[in-house]
Amino acid sequence: MVGSLIMEEDIYLDLFLDPYTIQDDFPPAMSQLFSPGVPLDMHSLPSNPETVFHPHLGGVKKASTDFSSVDLSFLPDELTQENRDQTVTGNKLASEESCRTRDRQSQLQLPDEHGSELNLNSNSSPDPQSCLCFDDAHSNQPSPETPNSNALPVALIASMMPMNPVPGFSGIVPQLQNVVSTANLACKLDLRKIALNAKNTEYNPKRFAAVIMRIREPRTTALIFSSGKVVCTGAKSEEESRLAARKYARVVQKLGFPVRFFNFKIQNMVGSCDVKFPIRLEILALTHRQFSSSYEPELFPGLIYKMVKPQVVLLIFASGKVVLTGAKERSEIYEAFENMYPILESFKKV
């Protein structure tokens, strides 16, 4: 009787403890970060990430690797290279179009010197490269290995940079004072015979081994050598210098020499002008020593300034007078003065 009672108590005790036993088989619901009293080893993860332990099942189950049923619609579609090119091209065209629109609006609102609005032709469109519009969202920095095809040309960048000094704004035109030219008569000459028979000649072989001959129109002077070379000086233009050299050749030909006119060439041109203001030559000489400028007022009252391009030598005086020499073309005289004028203005005496 007592044994049966003990067995019944055991059965009731098992029935009473079964629910609590099942609950103890599950891992704790709270994370180990929120249960400091539990050791870390009790809830350590399995060594193989692809396996999942189920203690209440008493076994190990492989994790599923099939993601075909997962909804990935929230992820953005990856752009291909073609789509990227199309996107960049579209953004570039939109930027250029906005530049054209702003350029037309600014030109329509720009008044001329009389105050009237400019009438622009709507068919004319500005150069796309002249509109410098940059989009921060789509601009890419060019790398040294891969040059950027959208980069601005070097010539365009150079044209946007201001030149200093700026030529062509002084309003002063240097006047030619002397043109030196040479020619070859292609024959040997008897200088004594020329000096005795020609007018307006000088010949002193002890002082200078050439005949000095002068004519009135154009008023020039020629040096005639026994080798047939002629040097003509004093002309005011290239045409006058050539005409004078041919006249000297004609005079020598009339004296019986087989003269032929060859190799006429301009060797030197001298021009002068006045800037109409005094110049501080001492400071100019100190700041432009790299151009071989020399100023010795005890020896010569002017500053000698040797320009590199064009190769022209300038004699600058404190009164504002400028002499330019060493040019072989008229344009070099004008270019050298226009390059020098801003420098002279910066050293103007106040």
Curated annotation (Swiss-Prot):
Pfam families: TBP. It comes from the Eukaryota. InterPro entries: TBP, TBP_CS, TBP_dom_sf, TBP_eukaryotic. Belongs to the TBP family. The keyword Transport does not apply. GO terms for molecular function: DNA binding. Interacts with TAF3. This is TATA box-binding protein-like 2. Residues 94-116 have a biased composition (Basic and acidic residues). PROSITE patterns: TFIID. One of its GO terms (biological process) is DNA-templated transcription initiation. Keywords: Cytoplasm, Developmental protein, DNA-binding, Nucleus, Transcription, Transcription regulation. Its main location: cytoplasm. Residues 118-128, 139-150 have a biased composition (Polar residues). Residues 82-150 are annotated as: Disordered. Transcription factor required in complex with TAF3 for the differentiation of myoblasts into myocytes. The complex replaces TFIID at specific promoters at an early stage in the differentiation process. It is found in: Cytoplasm; Nucleus. Expressed in myotubes and myofibers (at protein level). Expressed in a wide variety of tissues with highest levels in heart, lung, liver, uterus and placenta and especially the gonads. Expression is higher in the ovary than the testis, and within the ovary expression is localized to the oocytes. It comes from Mus musculus (Mouse). PANTHER family: TATA-BOX BINDING PROTEIN (PTHR10126). HAMAP family: TATA_bind_prot_arch.
